[in-house]
């Protein structure tokens, strides 16, 4: 695991300029953005430090994962305010066996994924509806172009971990299943769009609706 983390750090540093080239955030006219209500004189190195990846990166991948579902730990400007105006962000993605990151898009950035541990099947669909897929091994990288619908799937019986870099401090996330079936679009509209019936649409919606809290 130590060698995997070393590889992760080296390639993350190398990939950072690539993410910046693809950046789409507005330029700023200062060195960095001071949060509202903060005094510049009180800012220290702590402001430019993010420690939220310590737990996922220290996980023993040979042991059962504490969460049976796909999880993501983000370092965007929401979690790491120093990224505001810097046109870069990261995420650690954890895939227990037989889990996936469902089809989704990032409207404001491409995604550069580095597989640190395990194996993944990934893919995206371009604007001509052509599907591009690849099976990744640890150490492989894959780029999902900006705005394209894409996914990652761990079909094996071992966990996988990846690091994703984005050319935006807030790349955004649009989940295709939730956006289509979880936003109260009329059942008749969806049934006609997918050439099916309303009961089928209602079943799909039910599967994406969180259970009511007691």
From Swiss-Prot:
The keyword DNA repair does not apply. Residues 59-202 form the Cupin type-1 domain. GO terms for cellular component: apoplast. Transmembrane segments: none annotated. Glycans are attached at residues 42, 60, 69. Mn(2+) binds at residues 104, 106, 111, 150. Residues 1-23 form the signal peptide. InterPro entries: Cupin_1, Germin, RmlC-like_jellyroll, RmlC_Cupin_sf. Keywords: Apoplast, Glycoprotein, Manganese, Metal-binding, Secreted, Signal. It is found in: Secreted, Extracellular space, Apoplast. Gene3D superfamilies: Jelly Rolls (2.60.120.10). GO terms for molecular function: manganese ion binding. Oligomer (believed to be a pentamer but probably hexamer). May play a role in plant defense. Probably has no oxalate oxidase activity even if the active site is conserved. Belongs to the germin family. This is Germin-like protein 9-3. The lineage of its organism: Eukaryota, Viridiplantae, Streptophyta, Embryophyta, Tracheophyta.
